[in-house]
Amino acid sequence: TSSAILKNEPSNRTSSIIAVNLNIDKRDSIIKPKRGYIVSLTSKYAGLGGNREYSKSTGKGRIYFPLITDSIVVSSEIEAGALSMNNGTSTASERFYLGGRTLRGFQYGGVGPRDLTVNESLGGTNYTVGRAEVSFPLGLPKELNMYGGVFGELGKVWGLDATVPPGTNVNLDDSIRSS
């Protein structure tokens, strides 16, 4: 069964979206960067047509630098997003989810607001993620091009603007999760 919150969402939704992207890539290599940074900003506006009206923005920045030698590389990243409804409440497809590829160590949708009645992820109107990684040679022949890595990630999803029906047990825990 599905969450009562999700069942109460409007079934007939249409939207027209205009988006603006800004990407800056100053890495020394797109395959195995050792130095530089990459920044990506996206802003979307829905409301030029249809019955949905909202603004949704995301941003991500990652920096790379060598540690001790050029073969040991540290990368650090921060990512965030916000959804703002201009009228009505957000739907599941408009909200943010973390887990899987977006926060390693958690299943997709495993972080953030959740309907405990049916154990279903509801997503949130805001999210933030921080990542750090160190890659290093394994001492194998260079031709194999194999590296080891150690990473750490933390993130959270918060903000649920949906109406919660009586009898629905929602966990709005917005704790920072890490792996």
Where are these regions (language model features)?
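Alpha-helical scaffold segments in soluble metabolic enzymes
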Residues: 21
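C-terminal transmembrane beta-barrel domains of outer membrane proteins
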Residues: 4, 15-18, 35-179
